[in-house]
Amino acid sequence: MRFLIGALLTLQTLVQASSMSSMPNSYPVPEAPAEGGFRSVVYFVNWAIYGRGHNPQDLKADQFTHILYAFANIRPSGEVYLSDTWADTDKHYPGDKWDEPGNNVYGCIKQMYLLKKNNRNLKTLLSIGGWTYSPNFKTPASTEEGRKKFADTSLKLMKDLGFDGIDIDWEYPEDEKQANDFVLLLKACREALDAYSAKHPNGKKFLLTIASPAGPQNYNKLKLAEMDKYLDFWNLMAYDFSGSWDKVSGHMSNVFPSTTKPESTPFSSDKAVKDYIKAGVPANKIVLGMPLYGRAFASTDGIGTSFNGVGGGSWENGVWDYKDMPQQGAQVTELEDIAASYSYDKNKRYLISYDTVKIAGKKAEYITKNGMGGGMWWESSSDKTGNESLVGTVVNGLGGTGKLEQRENELSYPESVYDNLKNGMPS
């Protein structure tokens, strides 16, 4: 996700992506989109309930087909566990009772279940890992015992907490051994999920997805075709292409490389998508990740030029929520040929790379023209509302909510340890 900084320190050393400056492309005839329609996927982070004041109830649930609840952590044994039990299961929201009999779940988990109950097309997945916790994958993934523990405990959390599947965010396997271990980890999870599905009263298939890299130095190490056998879809992290680790300011989520300023586009979504397809991943299983934030460059004369520092940010230096954009005094530039945009304040010499509504619309065009599986966003707290919503813009560009995947969620969790969830959260 957004926690890619360490891995991206080496990005500027890569060979520039091949030039392609217009929306038409040289794909083979695209496959049909995701069965039943496009996927609309968003990450909800459990720490958003604190300073950001963003809670599950704030989600515009009818715009999404999948919410990825981030993040669970991993012990050396392979055990998957919740990272913040107060936020996840304990916090009492308005309407939650303190004297309710039984062993009950509250917090964001209860609110996620209620969203599903009121929006039967909405699926939720427990996302495991993320940038901060990714170092914890290596040890358990390396042994059969560790992989089994990972699969069994992630499945138990899914059954206890009312999720529709598991999302794995390992950033990133570093060599061939870890890449092979990742395949085996996915296999173990898929087998555990399918075994539970087979004995589940409703026979529902539970989902397995991953957050996948858009940088060649990371995805070229992966066994993409082998991984694909076990995955329902891929959430391609097509952002953080440029940032504080670079020598010049750049676009951080462009679709195509720039022919006029190639130094500003060290990577591109289009190259990653093409490489995944070439490796054997169907286009309709690739969900294009898009940012709901911008990356900043201070003391710069413009895009593709040197900078010094990144300035402030909404919650961390150099990173601004989309809802805080554009800043007063800044002029917005939209480059439709590469599907990228940025704001620049020439007096402050401050540049922020982020997606505008127009560029979000271009990305929706790219998804539809190339038979992709839909769109994904990091992360839900940062969008605007109404006509300025990037999520809403893309969903409308895909044809509206009626064109989204229609696949009913699961509400029956007879093996949950929580009485209220096992009973369907009666009012």
Swiss-Prot record:
Q: Which residues bind chitin?
A: 102-103, 129-132, 172, 237-240, 378
> What InterPro entries has UniProt attached to this entry?
Chitinase_II/V-like_cat (IPR011583), Chitinase_insertion_sf (IPR029070), Glyco_hydro18_cat (IPR001223), Glyco_hydro_18_chit_AS (IPR001579), Glycoside_hydrolase_SF (IPR017853), Glycosyl_Hydrlase_18 (IPR050314)
Q: Which residues form the active site?
A: 171 (proton donor)
Instruction: Tell me which Gene Ontology terms the entry assigns under biological process.
Output: chitin catabolic process; polysaccharide catabolic process
Q: Does the keyword Signal apply?
A: yes
Q: Give the SMART domains listed for this entry.
A: Glyco_18
What is the top EC class of this enzyme, as a single word? hydrolase
Write the signal peptide boundaries. Answer: 1-17
What reaction is this protein's catalytic activity?
Answer: Random endo-hydrolysis of N-acetyl-beta-D-glucosaminide (1->4)-beta-linkages in chitin and chitodextrins
- Please state every residue range assigned to the domain named GH18: 38-401
An MF annotation (GO) of this entry:
chitin binding
Q: Name one GO cellular component term.
A: extracellular region
| Record key words, sorted | Carbohydrate metabolism, Chitin degradation, Chitin-binding, Glycoprotein, Glycosidase, Hydrolase, Polysaccharide degradation, Signal
The source's superkingdom equals Eukaryota
UniProt-annotated glycosylation sites, renumbered to this chain: 387
Which EC number(s) does UniProt give? Answer: 3.2.1.14
Annotated family: Belongs to the glycosyl hydrolase 18 family. Chitinase class V subfamily.
The name this protein carries in UniProt is: Endochitinase 1
Organism, scientific name: Coccidioides immitis (strain RS) (Valley fever fungus)
